[in-house]
Amino acid sequence: RRGFVPLWQERLFGPDVDGRPDPRPDYYRYLPSFYTNRILQLSEGIESSDLGTYNDLALRSMREWITDPSKSQMDYDNMFRMNYNRNKSGASGIYMIEERHTDQRDFNFAANIAHTFRNQSVLRGGLTARINRTEYYDQVKDLLGADYWLDVDKFALRDNGNYNPLLSQNDLDYYLKHGEARRVGEGDKFSYDYYANLRQAQVWAQYYASFGGFTMSLGGEVGYTAMWRDGRLRKGLFANNSLGKSKTLDYLTYKLKGEFSYRFSGAHAIDANVAYMVNPPQFRDAFVSARTRNTTTPGLDSEKVLGVDLSYNLNLPWITARVSGYYTSVADQSKVISYYDDTQSSFTNFAMSGIDKRYYGLEVGVVVPIWGGISFNGALSLGDYRYTSDANFTQTRDNSEEVLRGDKVLWDDLYVESTPQTALNLGLSYRGPRNWFASVDFNYYDRIYLSMNPARRTRAAYATVLRPDEAAQLPGAVKYTALMNL
């Protein structure tokens, strides 16, 4: 099987890095939180008049967002006007719409075989293979009236000025050949262009047997994964580490799994499952900044997963129920988060490794027939999902090889985010003749934790947190806290 899957994302391009206003209404400098954050950052030694100024700016920003539509909408007329004015002098446009592409080519192969023995046990086996090449690139979608777009790294241009124009080139080879930065038009690739290459192969086997009320299934898999980045452009900031192939990351993986079931009678049965897996890291987490260079994530390792669960099944004419307990541990995960860090005035990459998690809990499900095709159904899930270690991290600038900092993310024993750890479902369902079906359900979810910003969980971040006695000394501290909550 082969496939070609193009994906893209349109985005307005024109960041505020060279003194021109950012056109996005939700740009962080236009929001009330920008001014309240400044109050907190400058809390020590700030004059009371400055506190009042920032407070007034925050209130004005909030009022404008609520009452002035021009503050919450894109001003395309102004963007076209500014681009047209640039055309008169032959200069590059300053606003345009980009289209970020993810074009995937995927080839898959699978073969399997099975043999049934005289005792009706079954042995199955097979192999799978995959070749994937995904191209990531940026493309000019709409110039918004401009004649062309200059393909340079504006952040590098801001940081390095004009003393070394080589550093700001997104396509250094073009600059060295023609003596000027590349001019791109609508439909042209720009900014970044690279291939993510993946090769995978697995061999697996599974044995199934049944003896009286006991059944079991034992399985295993051994696999190999290789991945590498292939840059299509030589970036000026990383002239020796952006064009061409990166080193190949190789991983030997395996999986072991056992499923066991014993049926005491038609009404009572227990199931048990155990699995241990070693998985390769994801490509997106294997490189510090795949858009710009071949540098791999420090401390990158295979992910280890151990899972066990035990269930009791009840099946009677007047009730069907299942009670399950489970435990899962995950070790050595990696993750890369890219974001604009206003404390560094730069787009940064926050690469983490050694992320460990633990999940355990209890699940109960029940169905009770009531009358004439109407039945009651309910389900309850109670879990406890936490981080079990302090992950390692390295933070780098997107436009520099310099490591800004490296330490631990202090989230040991904190809750895993984004999934409910308490869930309840209650409902009534009706099954009528001719497959007619209707249901009414009530769902309740609790203990859903927001995703944590790991940059706020470092030793350096904790060192800047005010103690209660320090916060009490701030002029109007309660007032500004209330403002932040608004």
Predicted regions and their residues:
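Transmembrane beta-strands of outer-membrane beta-barrel proteins
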Residues: 1, 123-127, 216-220, 256, ...
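Outer-membrane beta-barrel domain signature, strongest for Gram-negative TonB-dependent receptors
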Residues: 1-132, 320-322
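Outer-membrane beta-barrel transmembrane strands
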Residues: 1-6, 92-136, 186-215, 249, ...
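Transmembrane beta-strands of outer-membrane beta-barrel pores
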Residues: 2, 129-135, 211-213, 222-228, ...
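Flexible, surface-exposed loop regions and adjacent strand-edge segments
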Residues: 3-18, 140-150, 155, 232-243, ...
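Signature of Gram-negative outer-membrane beta-barrel scaffolds
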Residues: 93-96, 100, 122-265, 392
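Gram-negative outer-membrane beta-barrel transporters
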Residues: 119, 327-329, 348-455
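Surface-exposed extracellular loop regions of Gram-negative outer-membrane beta-barrel proteins
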Residues: 171-183, 226-237, 248, 262-308, ...
